[in-house]
């Protein structure tokens, strides 16, 4: 669990506050955050401190913040911190904030947040969702009044749920003396209700339990759907009609996959919107919550040395690389319905590409950022099958251990052509990126586990030192590498002179290794995304038109692969992948950066 700390007060708006509903809008007083002197350069791991993270978050919103002002004066968003001091800002601790705002309206009704994990007995809930919620509680990021309910078909008591959840909670980094005490307090807030996902009756019973724990407070409810996609709509229908909040907000987090193609994705969206508004649907892609992905826009827009270079004039190619060193063991049946393109490329890598390539947004508001991402996706050239290589891992022995092939998995149909590896060259047809290849590569059962972005710059025209750097010009390419996982890092490859007599060049790294630079543990992506969902911050969630544009790009390719029954190229388990991926890169005059010695 990461070391975090949370703000002393939070921004309160009709759209984003987890503690207020429309009931309190008339009583709000606008005020500037007294800590507005913080710079947006505040990027990365001090951004690991959620106190500063939330302050920066409140600064970048176009909406206004609200706290109570001592003399009743109004300080607007545009006010300076000195002006805020003049009117007398009263600092409100986060756990007392909802009480103060409620009292400012002359009432005594407090608010609460009820979080229901639908599919609570599944692996995702146990390994990611409950630990992330505990991390937020441990750092004081959850409101004073909150309740967590597990909901699943499995028969289980509250005590049994707590035992199950407790096995995955940890304070491994911080080693604070009150860790056990915090765990005990958190588990007391966790309850369980057994029910079918398509049963109105069972969700009515859940609603009654939620009301008992909400105790008449203003209720805000978050449902996390950690269930198979074929039962999303049933669960949403029941939750919306039988267990949604009547006086606060109701939000639903939906896990991928969001369909298999444009048609099924559109049908899913249409079905969800029968019961929810678009702003109630939080489509989660956990890669967007990873620290280095979130830092991507900060790196670009807050550092003058990068933004002027961020175009076809200086960048030769961009690579988005995802690799896992294990196969589909245990979940091959599920994976076979989707394949690596749907599982990784169409969502994780494409979302990162859109963030990387977008134009400067009007602001850091969620809608402005997502508008720019959609423009990128709509500008992308249709993907040709000739610019794609697919592969499937086969059995291979390493160090005396024999690893299975994909089709050795008993849950995978014999003779399956589902790719476990894919590489593709994509292009953006706009003025900034015309002609620049964006290469994606994703695979399972490879030689390493990693996720990274590699930006290879153009060669220096008329380079005076070509004679000193050998015949392979690619060896002297400047390259910016953003390593998302593991061992988060940002490094820039530069050429420099080797010390000594004579003139010999060497390539070295200017390296920001997060673990060496920052003592705090990086928060898990689910911590950030859950906190965003509670606060109503949508910047890292996928909007329906983004989803439509992403599927419009990949659906024709997937259809062609399946109709032609394209045979994947086999590669040994634990290798670098199929040889065809190297030919694809060479076709576009590119070398895969992850094959270099810096790995």
Curated annotation (Swiss-Prot):
Subcellular location: Plastid, Chloroplast stroma
GO molecular function: glucose-6-phosphate dehydrogenase activity; NADP binding
Tissue: Expressed in roots, flowers and siliques.
Active site, per annotation: 348
GO biological process: glucose metabolic process; pentose-phosphate shunt, oxidative branch
Keyword NADP: yes
Chain segments carrying region Disordered: 1-23
EC numbers, comma separated: 1.1.1.49
Transit peptide: 1-66
Record's keyword annotation contains Transit peptide: yes
Pfam family, one: G6PD_C
Protein keywords: Acetylation, Carbohydrate metabolism, Chloroplast, Disulfide bond, Glucose metabolism, NADP, Oxidoreductase, Plastid, Transit peptide
EC class of the enzyme, as a word: oxidoreductase
Binding site for NADP(+) 2: 441, 454, 483, 491-493, 576
Biased composition regions of type Low complexity, renumbered to the chain: 1-18
Reactions mediated catalytically: D-glucose 6-phosphate + NADP(+) = 6-phospho-D-glucono-1,5-lactone + NADPH + H(+)
Annotated coiled-coil segments of the chain: none
Binding locations of D-glucose 6-phosphate: 256, 286-290, 324, 343, 444, 449, 485
Reported function: Catalyzes the rate-limiting step of the oxidative pentose-phosphate pathway, which represents a route for the dissimilation of carbohydrates besides glycolysis. The main function of this enzyme is to provide reducing power (NADPH) and pentose phosphates for fatty acid and nucleic acid synthesis which are involved in membrane synthesis and cell division.
UniProt-listed HAMAP family: G6PD
Protein name, per record: Glucose-6-phosphate 1-dehydrogenase 3, chloroplastic
């Amino acid at each position: 669990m990461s070391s975090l700390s949370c703000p002393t007060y939070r921004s309160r708006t009709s759209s984003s506050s987890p503690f207020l509903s429309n009931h309190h809008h008339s009583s709000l007083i606008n005020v500037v955050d007294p800590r507005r002197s913080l710079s947006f350069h505040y990027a990365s791991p001090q951004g690991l401190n959620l106190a500063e993270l939330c302050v920066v978050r409140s600064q970048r919103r176009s909406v206004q913040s609200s706290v109570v002002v001592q003399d009743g004066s109004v300080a607007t968003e545009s006010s300076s911190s000195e002006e805020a001091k003049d009117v007398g800002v009263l600092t409100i601790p986060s756990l007392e904030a909802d009480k103060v705002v409620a009292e400012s309206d002359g009432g005594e009704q407090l608010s609460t947040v009820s979080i229901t994990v639908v599919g609570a007995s599944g692996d995702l809930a146990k390994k990611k969702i409950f630990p992330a919620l505990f991390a937020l509680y441990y750092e004081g990021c959850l409101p004073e009044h909150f309740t967590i309910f597990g909901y699943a078909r499995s028969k289980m008591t509250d005590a049994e749920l707590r035992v199950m959840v407790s096995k995955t909670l940890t304070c491994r980094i911080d080693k604070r003396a009150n860790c056990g005490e915090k765990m005990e307090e958190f588990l007391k807030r966790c309850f369980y209700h057994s029910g079918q996902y398509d049963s109105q009756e069972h969700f009515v019973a859940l609603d009654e339990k939620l009301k008992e724990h909400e105790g008449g407070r203003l209720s805000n409810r978050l449902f996390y759907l950690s269930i198979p996609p074929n039962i999303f709509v049933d669960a949403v229908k029941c939750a919306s009609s039988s267990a949604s909040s009547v006086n606060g907000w109701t939000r639903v987090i939906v896990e991928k996959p969001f369909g298999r193609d444009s048609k099924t994705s559109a049908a899913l969206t249409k079905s969800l919107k029968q019961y929810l508004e678009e702003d109630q649907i939080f489509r989660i892609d956990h890669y967007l919550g990873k620290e280095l992905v979130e830092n991507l826009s900060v790196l670009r827009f807050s550092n003058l040395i990068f933004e002027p270079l961020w175009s076809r004039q200086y960048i030769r190619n961009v690579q988005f690389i995802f690799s896992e060193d294990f196969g589909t063991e245990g979940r091959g049946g599920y994976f076979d319905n989707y394949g690596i393109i749907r599982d990784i490329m169409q969502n994780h890598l494409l979302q990162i590409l859109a963030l990387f390539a977008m134009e400067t947004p009007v602001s850091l508001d969620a809608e402005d950022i997502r508008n720019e991402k959609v423009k990128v996706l709509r500008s992308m050239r249709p993907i040709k099958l000739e610019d794609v290589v697919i592969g499937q891992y086969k059995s291979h022995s390493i160090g005396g251990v024999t690893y299975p092939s994909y089709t050795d998995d008993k849950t995978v149909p014999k003779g399956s052509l589902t790719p476990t590896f894919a590489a593709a060259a994509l292009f953006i047809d706009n003025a900034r990126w015309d002609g620049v290849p964006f290469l994606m590569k994703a695979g399972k059962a490879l030689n390493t586990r990693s996720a990274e972005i590699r930006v290879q710059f153009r060669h220096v025209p008329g380079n005076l030192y070509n004679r000193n750097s050998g015949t392979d010009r690619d060896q002297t390419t400047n390259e910016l590498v953003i390593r998302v996982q593991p061992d988060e890092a940002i490094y820039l490859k530069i050429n420099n002179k080797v010390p000594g007599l004579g003139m010999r060049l060497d390539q070295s790294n200017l390296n920001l290794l997060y673990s060496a630079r920052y003592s705090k543990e990086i928060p898990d992506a689910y911590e950030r995304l859950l906190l965003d969902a509670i606060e109503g911050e949508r910047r890292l969630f996928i909007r329906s038109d983004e989803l439509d544009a992403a599927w419009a790009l990949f659906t024709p390719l997937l259809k062609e692969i399946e109709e032609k029954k394209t045979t994947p190229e086999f590669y040994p388990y634990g290798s670098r992948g199929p040889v065809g991926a190297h030919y694809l890169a060479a076709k576009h005059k590119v070398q895969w950066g992850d094959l270099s010695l810096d790995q």
